[in-house]
Each structure stands twice: as structure tokens, then as C-alpha cells.
Amino acid sequence: MKSAFERVSEITDELFAVVHFAGVYMLDSLVEMDSAAFERIFKINLGGVYLINKTFLPLLKSGSRIVITTSELAPLDPLPFTGVYAVSKAALDKYAYSLAMELQLMGIKVSVLRAGAVATDMLGVSTDALDRFCKNTTLYACNAERFKQIVDSVEARSVSPSRIAEKTLRILSKRKPRFAYSINRNPLLLLLNVLPKRLQLWIIKQVLKQK
């Protein structure tokens, strides 16, 4: 990271924006997953953003922007088996809001883009992770195949990376950007989230229980 900062500093002494798109996906049971994998997703999805912002802050001036792509899941209640990914993105969303509170004092604006499924290689990773989970789980074998059908239906409604890029450019062009923006959010997930938590739990249990 230090060498990256030094190379950028050789070219310019000021950045208008730092934009975060990178992240990793994980699908697994919270009680079956490897502890190293649990730590890794937070180190990348949250720790990576923290480290980049901290490193490149000297190049950000009043009027500069930071845009962080989180997930449509970030403000929602987590679903089973995608919990660790959703929690890492929720933590990233909270980090971004706290960062916005701090950096506004320096004239730097922070926004998040909460995106639904995007047609990138991550969808393939998601499918592979789901297949691996369905094959390896010993506690939820009766539920896994049904969950696979649900995830497949959610991910079928994806947008292209160019749509994300266009949305990001629009955010950067705004004189007074909002903190949160959304794109391609799944209406069924939004509907589930407005229900009482007790009802959410019951619905998920009915959907995933063994027939």
C-alpha cells in the first residue's frame, strides 16, 4: 500500500476521489465455517477500505470525495448462510457513515452505493460458494437445495458493471451528494425486511424447512 501511495504521489499531489469497488463474497453457515475464512472476509471487505482511505488521505483535499460500494444487504437484516457476507457489508456501511461524520469536518464527502447483484465474476464465485456449501454442509443438508433455488432467483436479476460505473459518476458529479444511493435492489428482500423480525424468522423457517 505504501508503494502504491508513493507511485500516485509522483503523479499528483491531490485526488478528487477515492472509489471502492473491490470485495469478496462468502456463503457458509456461521457455525460451520472456518475461523480463518471468517476473519479473511472482514480483513478484505472492511479492512481493505480502511487501509486505502487511511493511506491516501493526505492526497484528499476539501471538496474531495470517497465513494464506497457496499451491498443492498448492508442496511437489511441478514439472511441465513449469507450472514457473514452481509455482516461484513453492514460493518462497512457503518464504517462509511462514521467516516462521513469525521471527514465532513475537512470538507471531504463520503457516500455509499448499495448495489444489488452485479454481472461480474463475483456471481460465478457466488454460485461456486453455494454449490460448495450445499455439498459440504452436515447440519443443513435438508435445507441447502431449497436455499440454492432462492439465491439463484435473486442473482438472476443483475445489472452490468457499466451501470455501476455510470451511477458512481453521477454521484461524483453532484455538488451535494447524499450519503446513501441504491441500484438494483431486490423488491422481495426489501419487503421481507419491513416485516417484524419474528415473522421474518417464521417465513425463512417455512421456506427452508425439510418437506
Task: Please place each PLM-identified region on the residue numbering.
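Substrate-binding pocket helix/loop in short-chain dehydrogenase/reductase
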Residues: 29-30, 37-39
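Conserved NAD(P)H cofactor-binding loop of Rossmann-fold oxidoreductase domains
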Residues: 21-26
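Alpha-helical segment proximal to the catalytic Tyr-Lys
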Residues: 58, 101-102
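Hydrophobic positions on the long internal alpha-helix
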Residues: 4, 19, 52-56, 60, ...
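SDR active-site lid
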Residues: 105-178
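Active-site helix of classical SDR
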Residues: 53, 88-91
